[in-house]
Design a protein with these regions (language model features):
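Short acidic/His/Gly/Ser-rich catalytic and metal-binding motifs that mark active-site loops
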Residues: 19-22, 96-100, 161-162
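Catalytic cores of large soluble enzymes that bind and process phosphate-bearing ligands
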Residues: 10, 62, 66, 105-108, ...
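Glycine-rich tight-turn/loop motif centered on a GG-T
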Residues: 22-34, 101-109, 169-174
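Radical SAM enzyme core and accessory elements
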Residues: 141-149, 155-284
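Conserved C-terminal portion of the radical SAM core fold
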Residues: 35-99, 110-138, 145, 150, ...
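Single conserved hydrophobic/aromatic residue that forms the stacking wall/gate
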Residues: 1-7, 11
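Residue-level "edge-of-site" marker
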Residues: 15-16, 57-58, 156, 201-202
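Phosphate/diphosphate-binding glycine-rich loops and adjacent basic-rich segments that engage nucleotide
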Residues: 9-30, 41-44
């Protein structure tokens, strides 16, 4: 539940903000201390890790309680550190081994879940919003139109799932979207989105307060779009199927002219040409 990368970011899922419910679900073990668990982001920020992500498992308690808790947590971080969450994740209770959604009286139906996602997007327009492959292709398509900005493809939930020898029967939960990454990328293009593999902001130190200032003042556009196109081009050259590669090139041709700054636009054209000739890892 907690991932740190080069001491630059921390993503932690709260499970539930209801203290009583949390303690019932975590009766013992290192996660049993509600206060310590809930203040993990504060400790990360105090230690100089200025990029954090929030998440709550919708369905463990009433969605109203969790929704308010999540936004109050974001508001607290912004008030104390002048930096809101870089991402907000919105998983919900889904079927899995020994997990029946009908056993959870607070499980969200699709319509309510869509409203929760839309309201979080309105309340925190600066944040990246994540939905996983627990959701179906149809639901992920609907959520993309409501504010989701980050999705996965080709995910594994089993122990050692990305290795050659997978531990059988170790899946944490069932996937509802089993498409490959290539299929998800091409699907996004068909839906008029620009898939991006960019990590430039992390690598250049554009995190925390610097990142927040840029996204809140719409200063990130001349960076995100060019980097998205160049990283997508690199994916197309190295990994994509023939159809997806063709769709990537068509998308780039359509989008390149919409980069507002002329110098950035020309630089992006140069980077795209360089990628086609074999250069890699180019970004602003």
């Amino acid at each position: 539940h907690c991932i740190s990368s080069a001491a630059s970011d921390v993503y932690k899922r709260q499970e539930t903000y209801n203290k009583e419910n949390y303690e019932n679900l975590h009766a013992y073990g290192p996660k049993s201390n509600y206060d310590y668990h809930t203040t993990a982001h504060d400790r990360a920020m105090d230690a100089g890790i200025d990029d954090v992500g929030l998440g709550v498992l919708y369905g463990l308690d009433s969605y109203e309680y969790e929704f308010i808790g999540q936004l109050m947590h974001a508001e607290h971080l912004e008030a104390k550190y002048n930096v809101g969450p870089h991402t907000i994740s919105v998983p919900r209770i889904q079927p899995g081994d020994d997990v029946d959604v009908d056993d959870f009286e607070n499980a969200l139906d699709d319509d309510v879940f869509e409203k929760v996602v839309a309201c979080i997007r309105i309340a925190a327009p600066y944040t990246g919003m994540i939905v996983s492959t627990r959701e179906s292709e149809a639901m992920r398509a609907r959520l993309l139109d409501l504010g989701i900005s980050q999705i996965s493809g080709g995910s594994k939930t089993s122990v050692g799932g990305y290795t050659a020898n997978v531990t059988e029967g170790s899946d944490q939960f069932e996937l509802s979207d089993n498409r490959t990454l290539d299929e998800v990328v091409d699907w996004l293009i068909e839906k008029d989105h620009i898939p991006s593999f960019c990590t430039a902001c992390y690598r250049k130190g554009r995190t925390g307060e610097v990142f927040m200032e840029m996204v809140k003042n719409v200063g990130i556009g001349n960076i995100c779009q060019p980097n998205a196109l160049v990283t997508l081009k690199e994916y197309g050259e190295d990994y994509a199927s023939e159809k997806t590669r063709a769709d990537i090139n068509a998308l780039i041709k359509k989008e390149i002219g919409s980069i507002p700054d002329k110098d950035v636009r020309e630089g992006t054209k140069d980077n795209l040409a360089a990628v086609e000739k074999g250069k890699r890892d180019l970004y602003i």
